[in-house]
Amino acid sequence: MKVISDIDEVLTTTRAVRRRLNFERPVEREIVEECLRLAQQATMGSNIEDWRFVAVTEVAQKEKIAAVYRDVWDQTVEIPLRERRPDTVTRLDPGVRGDEASQARQKRVLSSVKYLVDNIERTPVIMFACSTKPVPKAALGDRASGYYGSIMPIAWSFMLALRSRGLGSVLATAIVYHAEKLSEILKLPADTHPITMIPIAYTDTLDFKPAPRRPLNEILRWEQWTD
């Protein structure tokens, strides 16, 4: 049942939810399917539904996923930050942020991600968005834009639909660092590749606010970039 009907509220308050997920309340399969059915109206490349989804609810499966997720955290965050690897420090370390407010915000983000890593198996439903498109050879150019542009719109639409019904979620893309292990756990066909994990749970409150963002004049130019 929809609990938020105002589209502007849904668009401005759909957050990456980790700490405020209610792990104790079951999530009905019907609601998950309803939200995904709505999200299927998202745009896609060449009007071909190359997306596939796997919803995980069984404890044994979630425990396997949790082990992979924790290893990804160790390999991509915990160890690189401890060893002060420059690329990771520049991207994630709160200390390199320009002001105290940004530093505090980054500390909260890292803390909330770690909370989800430590509790992922408690999430009622863990959804995986996958693609059957050929994997692009380059991160930019080639078919990369079409590859990700054909899966992220449905993933975001799915999150919006969840939010409108009182559920929280987050795009946990880092887990595909171990895409092969995930594919084995989920028994994906050879032509199907995991793109992102989306943990799903009811939220402990509906009271989410718009996040602070840069002024539009810092990110928008008309006709060409003039700075």
Language-model features: locations:
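A generic local secondary-structure boundary/capping motif
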Residues: 114-118, 159, 184-188, 210
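Glycine/small-residue-rich phosphate/adenosyl-binding loop
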Residues: 55-148
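Solvent-exposed alpha-helices and their adjacent loops that cap or buttress functional pockets
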Residues: 45-48, 118-121, 188-190, 212-213
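Short, surface-exposed beta-edge/turn micro-motifs
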Residues: 50-51, 123-126, 194-195
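Small-aliphatic-rich amphipathic alpha-helix that forms the alpha element of a beta-alpha
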Residues: 35-40, 125-185
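N-terminal targeting/leader regions
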Residues: 1-26, 30-38, 47
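C-terminal helix-cap and adjacent tail motif
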Residues: 2-3, 13-19, 88-100, 193-227
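Short loop-to-beta-strand entry elements in the cores of soluble alpha/beta enzymes
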Residues: 46-57, 174
